């Protein structure tokens, strides 16, 4: 019980000291650059209707699909312990084949070409 009391006392003391120091430190004088919001390099006062690249959107959707594929295939080793592991293999192969065919179609249509 003595250890818990010591830890609580140290915690409260350290918190009080840090709070007191934060009030005593001098305030840094703000300038125009520190007061302006920074939003990923874009001018926050400009137009909010910037053109959005459709190719970037398609690449993002493909990334999400293949990320979901990994999440679906991670429990595949545990599927071997079921009563019918061949059914698990058939379903996982079907998912992989469907995603591979979709990727090939997207590639042949030129959806993965960033520059024309």
UniProtKB/Swiss-Prot annotation:
Name of the molecule in the record: NADH-ubiquinone oxidoreductase chain 3
EC number in record: 7.1.1.2
InterPro entries noted in UniProt: NADH_UbQ/plastoQ_OxRdtase_su3 (IPR000440), NDAH_ubi_oxred_su3_sf (IPR038430)
Membrane topology summary: Multi-pass membrane protein
Compartment annotation: Mitochondrion membrane
GO terms, molecular function: NADH dehydrogenase (ubiquinone) activity
Similarity comment: Belongs to the complex I subunit 3 family.
Top EC class, one word: translocase
TM region(s), chain numbering: 3-23, 56-76, 87-107
Reaction equation(s) it catalyzes: a ubiquinone + NADH + 5 H(+)(in) = a ubiquinol + NAD(+) + 4 H(+)(out)
GO cellular component, one term: mitochondrial membrane
Job description of the protein: Core subunit of the mitochondrial membrane respiratory chain NADH dehydrogenase (Complex I) that is believed to belong to the minimal assembly required for catalysis. Complex I functions in the transfer of electrons from NADH to the respiratory chain. The immediate electron acceptor for the enzyme is believed to be ubiquinone.
SS bond partners: none
Keywords: Electron transport, Membrane, Mitochondrion, NAD, Respiratory chain, Translocase, Transmembrane, Transmembrane helix, Transport, Ubiquinone
Keyword Translocase on entry: yes
PANTHER family xrefs: NADH-UBIQUINONE OXIDOREDUCTASE CHAIN 3
Keyword Acyltransferase: no
């Amino acid at each position: 019980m003595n250890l818990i009391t010591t830890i609580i006392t140290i915690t409260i003391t350290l918190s009080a000291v840090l709070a007191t120091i934060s009030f005593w430190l001098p305030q840094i004088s703000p300038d125009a650059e520190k007061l302006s919001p920074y939003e990923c390099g874009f001018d926050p006062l400009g137009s909010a209707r910037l053109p959005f690249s459709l190719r970037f959107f398609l690449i993002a959707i493909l990334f999400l699909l293949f990320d979901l594929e990994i999440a679906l295939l991670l429990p595949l080793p545990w599927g071997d312990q079921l009563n019918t592991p061949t059914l698990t293999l058939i379903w996982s192969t079907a998912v992989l084949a469907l995603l591979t065919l979709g990727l090939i179609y997207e590639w042949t249509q030129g959806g993965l070409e960033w520059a024309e």
